[in-house]
Amino acid sequence: MTMLRVNRKSLGVNFSARGEAEVLVWAPEAKTVNVWLVDKQRRLELINREFGYWSCITPEITPGDQYYIELDGKQLPDPASVYQPEGVTGPSEVVSLGAFHWTDHQWINIPQQEYIIYELHTGTFSSSGTFEGIIEKLPYLVELGITAIEIMPVAQFSGARNWGYDGVFPFAVQNSYGGPVALQKLVDACHAQGIAVILDVVYNHLGPEGNVLPMFGPYFTDKYKTPWGQAMNFDDAHSDAVRHYFMENALMWLRDFHIDALRLDAVHAIKDFSPKHWLRELRERVAMYHLRFRTGRDRAAARSLATTVLAQPLLRFR
């Protein structure tokens, strides 16, 4: 099993301190895995590692490159893509999440009991339906006395408008909203105005259109059903990698996007009868991140909101 690093994202395409691209893909049933660079017309071979992971380190991948992951010759978007500029069926685009220039170094998250929350849908909150449109209306929210906004899910879904609960790329920020850098810019602007940011995330199911995860591995299980389709595989065979995938996702929002709290959708549908429920493990991992990498911004970053009373003791951090 690949090690979970709370200080950086491992899955997908990321960059080392030396600027080299590090690629990591979980595809336990594949015989060959490559990266196809669309614009450069280059194919890079990944090496088969333990537990179904494939990887390579290369200087040939740079930010802005569009690419596909090739599984036994079939081209697919990266399951850990952070940007899908052409939507769910198009190529993934390489983004260096660490390149954004943050100005919120003095931000300290406010206590949860002081949150005055405005829940908003990015696509309908402003005339442009974008993160930039939210920034333009921040003075209005400040005037209302809002201290936190809760953004409905932004994981890439099919089309330009959706409630957000049909996302199929959990790491990718919706292209029609502006993509990942625009979300970083929004959070930075919110903190400058004294507003905390809560992000709604969905870990119990994926949407019906554009879902490539089953082609990579057993991300789903037939042990359980949800009202929205197959349940995610948190406790069946090969579930360690699936648990890792969603754990990396939660940590990414806190670390790379400076999100202050996560609202987990329908936690009752996260079916897990492991000795340690995934939600409890999430609590421990976020606490570890909070203790090891705390900054002025992070002193209260380990607070998470949940949808049910049952889940609150597992996800609330004090």
Task: Give the role of each language-model region.
Residues 25, 69, 120, 141, ...:
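Conserved, mostly hydrophobic/aromatic
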Residues 50-54, 58-63, 124-196:
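Aromatic- and glycine-enriched glycan-recognition loops and surfaces
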Residues 26-33, 61-62:
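Short proline/glycine-enriched turn/loop motifs at strand-loop junctions of beta-rich domains
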